[in-house]
Amino acid sequence: MKIRKMLLADYDNVYSLWLNTSGMGLNDIDDSEAGIKKYLLRNPDTCFVAEKNSTIIGVVLSGHDGRRGLVYHLAVKASEREQGIGNALLENAIEALKGEGISKVYIMIFKNNAAGNAFWEKRGFVIPDESIYRAKEIALIKHIDT
């Protein structure tokens, strides 16, 4: 297994992996090829894919606003899970964010995503007592359930 920086050329394979991963929370704007291109241009050194025999089996998007890091869409192909691939992708993302001077990382997970919540909790991500996450859509977004 090899981990490398994600390229826009990986989009079709990565998107297919996301579609086949439960609880991803995709949408037609941010997760379109144009949306991912914009994200990769802004965060060229913090997004990674895992490959096995030249096939993408895992992915993580991460980036920052200069103060805090965010991790999005960590996914590993179902048949490749429980082998440390998710951990390795997360470690690469966190090290890349540290390298850019980021000291705190956030992740957003759906409440009903039990497997996802267990994964993040096991890795030290906590639900902060002092804050509430709020969101407002400022464009018409079509959500894609996985």
Report the location of each language-model feature.
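A short beta-loop-alpha structural element at the N-terminal edge
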Residues: 2-14
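A short helix-loop-beta-strand connector motif used in the catalytic cores of GNAT acetyltransferases and
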Residues: 37-49, 70
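Conserved beta-strand in the GNAT
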Residues: 49, 55-63, 70-75
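A conserved beta-turn-beta hairpin within the catalytic core of GNAT-like acetyltransferases
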Residues: 63-72, 81, 127-131
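A short, internal acetyl-CoA/4′-phosphopantetheine-binding micro-motif in the GNAT/acyltransferase core
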Residues: 74-81, 109-110
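Conserved acetyl-CoA-binding loop-helix of GNAT-fold acetyltransferases
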Residues: 82-95, 122
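Conserved GNAT acetyl-CoA-binding A-motif
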Residues: 97-109
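Conserved beta-strand-loop-alpha-helix junction that forms the acyl-donor binding cleft
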Residues: 107-116, 135
